[in-house]
Amino acid sequence: MNLKQELIERFTRYVKIDTQSNEDSHTVPTTPGQIEFGKLLVEELKEIGLTEVTMDDNGYVMATLPANTDKDVPVIGFLAHLDTATDFTGKNVKPQIHENFDGNAITLNEELNVVLTPEQFPELPSYKGHTIITTDGTTLLGADDKAGLTEIMVAMNYLIHNPQIKHGKIRVAFTPDEEIGRGPAHFDVEAFGASFAYTMDGGPLGGLEYESFNAAGAKLTFNGTNTHPGTAKNKMRNATKLAMEFNSYLPVEEAPEYTEGYEGFYHLLSLNGDVEQSKAYYIIRDFDRENFEVRKHNVENIVKQMQEKYGQDAVVLEMNDQYYNMLEKIEPVREIVDIAYEAMKSLNIEPNIHPIRGGTDGSQLSYMGLPTPNIFTGGENYHGKFEYVSVDVMEKAVQVIIEIARRFEEQA
């Protein structure tokens, strides 16, 4: 089985396991599917030939590829996450393989009229000639991050079968609940034992990221008073309208759909409820720490104003920081970025260095003493029915993992 075949076989099998995390759950991991998937990976890591394969009570999977050199090489790690996003259903994923893609629109689901078009997704024609894997238009795909996870598995398998490629000790970890910001919450950096690591959790070819958002989540509960609408004057307080009012105070142009690059945003992730009670969940993002704090204060001030207007119980805010910009922790060990950059260049991949408009486990791990930049995996349009991945780019990601391992040994 060549690299491409192994990537397709593993990836299409992995995405069929429902591993969506759950923001409302207080277990670790938050969903049983992640445990099921972790157990499968433990067996497969052992089959490949990795040692020290473990899965702890919190669902964290770790394994070792022993060094095959006498040189004193720093221990490096590669990480991916077990869970998939909560934004769209990840149950009953039916991956569709399109070999030698022609670059034109793909009808994902004729019955539901779901079509992946170059008009909506201009990058699509650039994958002409590739093997791409899409959804069937009814679920997300889960390439975030089962593409990265698959690439790590395939790279480790390749290194074991090609001992002529010299490398130091490599640690592998698969973490739960990344999509809800809890990935590293129970990650044992000491047990992992790497000097630094890379998350395989990026997007298109060449992506190399070591700046991330500062991130917070805000849960708002709006409490209303429900009465018969016919006699509601001066009595009714509509909780859903309170939620609408809160949202109206946020700057319209500072939302994900209007921002790019280094611009931050407020994002209403979910809103549900009725007259009696409504709940809204926002995420707050900014690269600049000072601006990040300003955004949080803005939310608090709006809540305070509404409480003064409608009563203390009308709006209840729960806000917590999720992770911080990892740049501060990467800069002192800049060589780990340089090695990844050089690895890509040697494979004729043009590195595309840009800030992560999102988070990876690396954001938090960097602050826990494990500096962790992020590398591309080949996926596009994450978290929805138009998600797809290029197997050709996945193959390149595998080559980058192998080349990084080789270069650390060579430069030791």
Curated annotation (Swiss-Prot):
Alphabetic keyword roster: Aminopeptidase, Cytoplasm, Hydrolase, Metal-binding, Metalloprotease, Protease, Zinc
Pfam families documented for this protein: M20_dimer, Peptidase_M20
Gene Ontology MF, one: zinc ion binding
PROSITE patterns, per database record: ARGE_DAPE_CPG2_1 (PS00758), ARGE_DAPE_CPG2_2 (PS00759)
Locations listed in the record: Cytoplasm
Chain positions recorded as Zn(2+) 2 binding sites: 144, 179, 383
SUPFAM superfamilies referenced in this protein's UniProt entry, alphabetically: Bacterial exopeptidase dimerisation domain, Zn-dependent exopeptidases
Reactions that this protein is recorded to catalyse: Release of the N-terminal residue from a tripeptide
CC cofactor note: Binds 2 Zn(2+) ions per subunit.
GO terms under biological process: peptide catabolic process; proteolysis
The EC number(s) this enzyme carries: 3.4.11.4
Positions of the catalytic residues: 83, 178 (proton acceptor)
Required cofactor names: Zn(2+)
Binding site for Zn(2+) 1: 81, 144, 201
GO cellular component annotations of the record: cytosol
UniProt entry tagged with the keyword Zinc: yes
Top enzyme category: hydrolase
Keyword Zinc recorded: yes
InterPro entries per the UniProt record, alphabetical: ArgE/DapE_CS, Bact_exopeptidase_dim_dom, Peptidase_M20, Peptidase_M20_dimer, Peptidase_M20B
Primary location group: cytoplasm
Family designation: Belongs to the peptidase M20B family.
HAMAP family: Aminopeptidase_M20
Name used for this protein in its record: Peptidase T
Taxonomic path: Bacteria, Bacillati, Bacillota, Bacilli, Bacillales
Gene label: pepT
